[in-house]
């Protein structure tokens, strides 16, 4: 029986295979084990991948918008951005707040008098950094912006700098989506107010204005009305012809005191409903 492989239980069994100790039988056994191991490993990888996709689908109601891979966190390389990051990180640990307003210069540059009048009383902390892309938000969420007590609500307004850097609307939307996934993972009990990108450039037919509209059409599908609420508050900035006037936006990107006053009047009721719905987990 030299070199024969038996299937059955014996004192020297490995599973249900008995191998007589010859070079040929050992080689055959190793071949069988290798094939079974590879098959099992492939099955494990498939299960893990599908589980990851299922988890992402459970967290958000929108799928990824491109096939370019998930955006990666990126640190700011300039001194001003890093100093502003440090101030925000200190504020989240030392300043009482209930809502974190993440954004770029449109958030950081919010008229301070109007902020103190309308947003500060609602417990909103300004976490905007001028020049930020979606990648930068991802990075700072993992480097101190969430180091304080968990926020009850998060307001997110980001993406216009991505578009200005000639990123596609789809890739910009993927960056926003990645932020939402991270926020849902890190702050599962918080409600997120996802703001549509605000209009820029004077004409409704301008390239970046159209790109803003494309991004908004994509990201609105990421809202479920419960954990993530979507709102477009920028239309109030436009005149009857859809144009952005210098009175509300002198450079057709950033806003004047009048522009921020108009935005605040549009944001306040949305924010109030969001916070009021935090206990019932339903915004109506």
Language model: regions and residue ranges:
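Intrinsically disordered, low-complexity proline-rich regions
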Residues: 9-12
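Oxyanion-hole/transition-state-stabilizing segment in secreted/luminal serine hydrolases
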Residues: 108-120, 134-177, 182, 193, ...
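Short amphipathic alpha-helices and their capping/turn segments at secondary-structure boundaries
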Residues: 86-100, 139-147, 181-184
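A short beta-strand-loop structural module common to alpha/beta enzyme folds
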Residues: 123-132
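A short helix->loop->beta-strand "cap" motif at the edges of active sites that frequently abuts
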Residues: 187-190
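N-terminal secretory targeting modules
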Residues: 4, 14-101, 106-113, 117, ...
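Extracytoplasmic/secreted proteins, especially bacterial periplasmic and envelope-associated proteins
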Residues: 101, 132, 136, 167, ...
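Catalytic His-Asp segment of secreted/periplasmic serine-dependent ester chemistry enzymes
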Residues: 199-284
């Amino acid at each position: 029986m030299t070199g024969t492989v038996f299937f059955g239980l014996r004192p020297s069994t490995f599973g249900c295979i008995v191998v007589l100790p010859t070079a040929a039988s050992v080689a055959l056994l190793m071949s069988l084990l290798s094939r079974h191991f590879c098959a099992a490993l492939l099955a494990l990888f498939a299960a893990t991948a599908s589980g990851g996709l299922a988890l992402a689908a459970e967290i958000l109601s929108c799928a990824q918008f491109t096939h370019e891979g998930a955006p990666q966190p990126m640190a700011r390389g300039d001194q001003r951005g890093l100093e502003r990051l440090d101030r925000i990180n200190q504020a989240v640990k030392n300043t009482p707040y209930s809502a974190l307003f993440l954004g770029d210069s449109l958030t950081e540059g919010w008229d301070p008098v109007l902020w103190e009048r309308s947003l500060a009383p609602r417990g909103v902390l300004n976490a905007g950094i001028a020049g930020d892309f979606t990648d930068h938000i991802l990075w700072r969420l993992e480097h101190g912006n969430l180091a304080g007590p968990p926020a009850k609500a998060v307001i997110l307004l980001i993406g216009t700098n991505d578009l200005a850097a000639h990123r596609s609307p789809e890739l910009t939307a993927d960056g926003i989506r990645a932020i939402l996934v991270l926020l849902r993972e890190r702050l599962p009990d918080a409600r997120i107010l996802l703001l549509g990108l605000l209009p820029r450039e004077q004409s409704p037919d301008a390239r970046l204005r159209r790109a803003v509209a494309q991004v908004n059409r994509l990201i609105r599908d990421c809202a479920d009305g419960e954990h993530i609420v979507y709102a477009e508050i920028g239309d109030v900035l436009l005149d009857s012809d859809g144009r952005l006037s210098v009175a509300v936006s002198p450079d057709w990107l950033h806003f004047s005191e009048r522009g921020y006053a108009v935005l605040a009047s549009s944001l306040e009721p949305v924010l109030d409903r969001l916070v009021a719905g935090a206990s019932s987990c339903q915004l109506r």
